[in-house]
Amino acid sequence: MARTSPPPPVCLALQGGGSHGAFQWGVLDRLLEAEALDFRAVTCASAGAMNAAALITGLEAGGFDGARKTLDKLWREINLSGGKNVFGDSAIWNAAFSPSWMKDTPLWRSAESLAMTMSPYQFNPFNLNPLRRVLDTVVDYEAVQRSDIRMFVATTAVRKGRVRLFENAELTQDVLLASGCLPHLFQAVELDGEPYWDGGYLANPPLWPLFYASTPDDILLLPLNP
């Protein structure tokens, strides 16, 4: 049921956590269905960054209902990509996107062994990533770039060992892939000639941008890791 009064403005903080990002989808879907909150800014990392990009894409295209549809499409596409990935049904991909109980199985252990003995530069020399197709299908980068909803995406600068934030105007597919780049699975993503890894290593998610930006005081944090 639609609200009779404007929803309160808030900032959203979306933590990364691989396939656990689907939990955020569920929470966001319920909030959007209730038209409960007016999202003015989103700070995010890794899977949270992909949720954020889908959220803003949908809000810009069709409001609350549009955001629900876009998030639904994101996770359905991710689910489909799991069976059509660069590694096929190999252990390393399936283990990375499987529930925690998988860690005690031979599948997970073989994936760990592979990750310790080979780098993605060896087992994935062409740097193929099924998430590229998913993001191309779901995210409208131009819509996010011009949106009034501020977005802060965390990445890890490999050589400097520091976090780097990207905002709306800088958002590209490579920025999202860098924010979710696990170095045991994928080659580092090059941005402006510098290699980047998953932003969750140093800021999961970064909260300080919200302290200094002209954003609402209230922050809704959706954690994926305790």
Language model segments and positions:
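Cofactor-binding loop segments of dinucleotide-utilizing enzymes, especially the Rossmann-like FAD-
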Residues: 224-226
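Patatin-like phospholipase
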Residues: 6-13, 18-123, 129, 135, ...
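Small-residue-rich anion-binding loops in enzyme active sites
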Residues: 1-13, 149-150, 158-159
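Active-site-adjacent alpha/beta core region of enzyme catalytic domains
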Residues: 87-222
